[in-house]
Amino acid sequence: MLDLAKEFLLLGFLEETEEDGAVTYIMDFPDDTYVTVTDDNGRTPVRAKQNLVLACYDKEGCYLWGSEFKTFMELQKLCQDNPAGSPQLLQILKSASKTLKDSEWSSPSHP
């Protein structure tokens, strides 16, 4: 069984403990953005085989985009092939599985 706390640190994520004791995994990027990782309930991931949600924010904390992964191993593969905090990794994470902001939708009702 994977020790997810250790595995996130090995991938280059920082561990931040919130006031309520919840742990958030964060990776900073050079363009003043950062990515957080939670489970699909917004909590600290505890199992390798659970959905993970990545959310990217700007330096003011405004949501930019999100990606979803079915398992930690999917995320791990992308992170292992690219340097932590690199622009390349940020782009790959963004493109992996995107949850679009409303302003990015393109459809007949949203041209």
Q: Across the structure, where does each feature detected by a protein language model lie?
A:
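Negatively charged, low-complexity tracts enriched in Asp/Glu with abundant Ser/Thr
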Residues: 1-32, 105-110
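Short amphipathic alpha-helical segments that mediate assembly, nucleic-acid/protein binding
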Residues: 1-4, 68-72, 85-93
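Intrinsically disordered, low-complexity regulatory segments enriched in Ser/Thr/Pro
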Residues: 33-80
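Acidic, proline/glycine-rich low-complexity IDRs
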Residues: 77-111
